């Protein structure tokens, strides 16, 4: 009986594998999706948001680590900016409780910032404060 059950299970597995080989390709993926997203064009929401930054730091969607490239802004001022959002414009940062020195620093680097609508994919949890990248 065990031998018969073993043979039947093997035959069922083999038949399933053979059926998978003869199925038309439309069963596996929608042709419209395959044509729409061919090659490296597949992107998710976070990738699109990052591409919209145009090389600038997005004040609504960037972590504090992105401010390291601006001397004097990381970590104190970067933390204030990240926690103070969301912003409608870059100049909204000036409404934060910043010292005169911090306001001067922000004015110095102002052209390096942009504002896009907040994305849940980039703002979930505390990833903007601690994105888990350690040296």
Swiss-Prot record:
One Pfam family linked to the record: PsbU
GO-annotated biological processes: photosynthesis; photosystem II stabilization
Subcellular localization, as worded in the UniProt entry: Cellular thylakoid membrane
Protein keywords: Electron transport, Membrane, Photosynthesis, Photosystem II, Signal, Thylakoid, Transport
Membrane topology: Peripheral membrane protein
InterPro entries cross-referenced by the UniProt entry: PSII_PsbU
Subunit structure: PSII is composed of 1 copy each of membrane proteins PsbA, PsbB, PsbC, PsbD, PsbE, PsbF, PsbH, PsbI, PsbJ, PsbK, PsbL, PsbM, PsbT, PsbX, PsbY, PsbZ, Psb30/Ycf12, peripheral proteins PsbO, CyanoQ (PsbQ), PsbU, PsbV and a large number of cofactors. It forms dimeric complexes.
Entry similarity comment: Belongs to the PsbU family.
Function description: One of the extrinsic, lumenal subunits of photosystem II (PSII). PSII is a light-driven water plastoquinone oxidoreductase, using light energy to abstract electrons from H(2)O, generating a proton gradient subsequently used for ATP formation. The extrinsic proteins stabilize the structure of photosystem II oxygen-evolving complex (OEC), the ion environment of oxygen evolution and protect the OEC against heat-induced inactivation.
Name of this protein: Photosystem II extrinsic protein U
Gene source species: Synechococcus sp. (strain CC9605)
Lineage start: Bacteria, Bacillati, Cyanobacteriota, Cyanophyceae, Synechococcales
């Amino acid at each position: 009986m065990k031998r018969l059950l073993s043979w039947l299970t093997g035959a069922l597995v083999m038949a399933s594998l053979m059926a998978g080989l003869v199925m038309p390709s439309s069963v596996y993926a929608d042709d419209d999706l395959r044509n729409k997203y061919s090659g490296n064009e597949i992107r998710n929401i976070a990738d699109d948001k990052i591409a919209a930054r145009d090389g600038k730091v997005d004040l609504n969607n960037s972590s504090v680590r992105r401010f390291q490239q601006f001397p004097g802004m990381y970590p104190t001022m970067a933390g204030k900016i990240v926690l103070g959002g969301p912003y409608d414009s870059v100049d909204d940062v000036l409404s934060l409780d910043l010292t005169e020195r911090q306001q001067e620093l922000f004015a110095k680097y102002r052209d390096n910032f942009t504002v896009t609508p907040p994305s849940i994919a980039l703002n979930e949890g505390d990833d903007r404060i601690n994105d888990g990248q350690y040296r």
